[in-house]
From Swiss-Prot:
Alphabetical GO biological process terms: mitochondrial electron transport, ubiquinol to cytochrome c
Further details from the record: Heme 1 (or BL or b562) is low-potential and absorbs at about 562 nm, and heme 2 (or BH or b566) is high-potential and absorbs at about 566 nm.
Superkingdom: Eukaryota
Protein name: Cytochrome b
PANTHER family: CYTOCHROME B (PTHR19271:SF16)
Record field: transmembrane: 33-53, 77-98, 113-133, 178-198, 226-246, 288-308, 320-340, 347-367
Names of the cofactor(s): heme b
A Pfam family that the UniProt record links to this protein: Cytochrom_B_C
Alphabetic keyword roster: Electron transport, Heme, Iron, Membrane, Metal-binding, Mitochondrion, Mitochondrion inner membrane, Respiratory chain, Transmembrane, Transmembrane helix, Transport, Ubiquinone
C-alpha cells in the first residue's frame, strides 16, 4: 500500500514541500532564515490575535487599552512584548534572508525574488501601521510625518494624504483604518509567502556554490527539519532573552507618553529597522527627491538580476565582489546609525555620503567589479 502522505490530496502538498522535497546537500545555515521567517509570521499572527481581543482602536482609549493589556490581562505583558520584539526578530531574519540572496545570487530565480521584494514591502507596511496603534507620541508623529511624505506627489499628493488620513489630520479615522490594515496584512503576507514557496519549489533551492545541485540531492526530512529546529530554538532563545530581560531596548521612550498633537517630540524617528531608509530620505534636501530615494532604496532590489554581470552566480569564489558586499553591509549599518541621530553636523554629511555610496555600490560598482573578475578569470 502506498504511503498516505504521498496520496492524500492535502498531505501530498505538505509532503512535497517539507518532507520528500529534494534539497541540495550543501546548503548552509544561511538557508535557515526562510523557515525562521515562517515561524516569526505564525508567532506574530498568534500574539497579534490575542492583543486584538483586548485592544480598542479609538484615540481616546487606544493608549489605555495597551496599558490595560500589560497590567490587567493574564500574561498580557509577555504577549505584548513578544509581539513588539517579535517584529524586530522578523526584520533581523528578513535582512539576513535578503542578504543571503544577494551574496549567493539567489535573485536569478526571478519569480521567487520578485515575490520576495513584494513581501518585503508588505511586511514594512504592516510594521509601519502596527507602530501607530499604541497611540504614543512616536506613534502619532511617526504616522503624521511618514503619511505626509505622499504630499510630495505632484498634483494629487495633498488629496491622497487627506484620503489616507480620513480627515485633515491623523485622528480617530486614521487609527481605525490602520488597525484594520494591520489585522488583514499578515494574512496577505501568509498568502504571498505560499506563492513565494510555490515558485521556489519550481526551480529548487540555490546553494552556496551557485552550481546546479541536481546530481546531489537529499530529502528535506530529516536532514533539514532537524537543522531548522535548531534555528527555531535559537530564535526563540534570543526573542525570550529580549522579552524577559530588556523588552524596551529597541523601543522609543517617547511612546510611553500618550499622543499629543500640540507637542512635537524633539527627534521623530521610526523603529530601528526603518532607520537606514529614513536616513536616505533625510539625506536629500528636496521632499520629492527624498521620497523617490526612500522608495528606490528598496525597489533597487528588483534590478539585481539585470545588474548581474558575472559569469558565476554566487560570490563564493569572487573575492572582490565579497569585499564590495561587506562594504555595502557596513554602509547600511552606518545609515541605520545616522537615521537615529539628530539632523546636524556631522551627521548630515555622513548620511549623504553613505546614501550615495549605497546606490553607487549596487548600481555601478558591483556590475563593474563583476566584469573585471570575469576578465581576470579569462572568461
Amino acid at each position: 500500500m502506498t504511503n498516505m502522505r504521498k496520496t492524500h490530496p492535502l498531505m501530498k502538498i505538505v509532503n512535497n514541500a517539507f518532507i520528500d522535497l529534494p534539497a541540495p546537500s550543501n546548503i548552509s545555515s544561511w538557508w535557515n532564515f526562510g523557515s525562521l521567517l515562517g515561524i516569526c509570521l505564525i508567532l506574530q499572527i498568534l500574539t497579534g490575535l490575542f492583543l486584538a481581543m483586548h485592544y480598542t482602536s479609538d484615540t481616546m482609549t487606544a493608549f489605555s487599552s495597551v496599558t490595560h493589556i500589560c497590567r490587567d490581562v493574564n500574561y498580557g505583558w509577555i504577549i505584548r512584548y513578544m509581539h513588539a520584539n517579535g517584529a524586530s526578530m522578523f526584520f533581523i531574519c528578513l535582512f539576513l534572508h535578503v542578504g543571503r540572496g544577494l551574496y549567493y545570487g539567489s535573485y536569478t530565480f526571478l519569480e521567487t525574488w520578485n515575490i520576495g521584494v513584494i513581501l518585503l514591502f508588505t511586511v514594512m507596511a504592516t510594521a509601519f501601521v502596527g507602530y501607530v496603534l499604541p497611540w504614543g507620541q512616536m506613534s502619532f508623529w511617526g504616522a503624521t510625518v511618514i503619511t505626509n511624505l505622499l504630499s510630495a506627489i505632484p498634483y494629487v499628493g495633498t488629496n491622497l494624504v487627506e484620503w489616507i488620513w480620513g480627515g485633515f489630520s491623523v485622528d480617530k479615522a486614521t487609527l481605525t483604518r490602520f488597525f484594520a490594515f494591520h489585522f488583514i496584512l499578515p494574512f496577505i503576507i501568509a498568502a504571498l509567502a505560499m506563492v513565494h514557496l510555490l515558485f521556489l519549489h519550481e526551480t529548487g533551492s540555490n546553494n552556496p556554490t551557485g552550481i546546479p545541485s541536481d546530481a546531489d540531492k537529499i530529502p528535506f526530512h530529516p536532514y533539514y527539519t532537524i537543522k531548522d529546529i535548531l534555528g527555531v530554538l535559537l530564535l526563540i532563545l534570543f526573542l525570550m532573552l529580549l522579552v524577559l530581560f530588556s523588552p524596551d531596548l529597541l523601543g522609543d521612550p517617547d511612546n510611553y507618553t500618550p499622543a499629543n498633537p500640540l507637542n512635537t517630540p524633539p527627534h521623530i524617528k521610526p523603529e530601528w529597522y526603518f532607520l537606514f531608509a529614513y536616513a536616505i530620505l533625510r539625506s536629500i534636501p528636496n521632499k520629492l527627491g527624498g521620497v523617490l530615494a526612500l522608495v528606490s532604496s528598496i525597489l533597487v532590489l528588483i534590478l539585481m538580476p539585470l545588474l548581474h554581470t558575472s559569469k558565476q552566480r554566487s560570490m563564493m569564489f569572487r573575492p572582490f565582489s565579497q569585499c564590495l558586499f561587506w562594504i555595502l553591509v557596513a554602509d547600511l549599518l552606518t545609515l541605520t546609525w545616522i537615521g537615529g541621530q539628530p539632523v546636524e553636523y556631522p551627521f548630515i554629511i555622513i548620511g549623504q555620503l553613505a546614501s550615495i555610496l549605497y546606490f553607487l555600490i549596487i548600481l555601478v560598482l558591483m556590475p563593474i567589479i563583476s566584469s573585471i573578475e570575469n576578465n581576470l578569470l579569462k572568461w
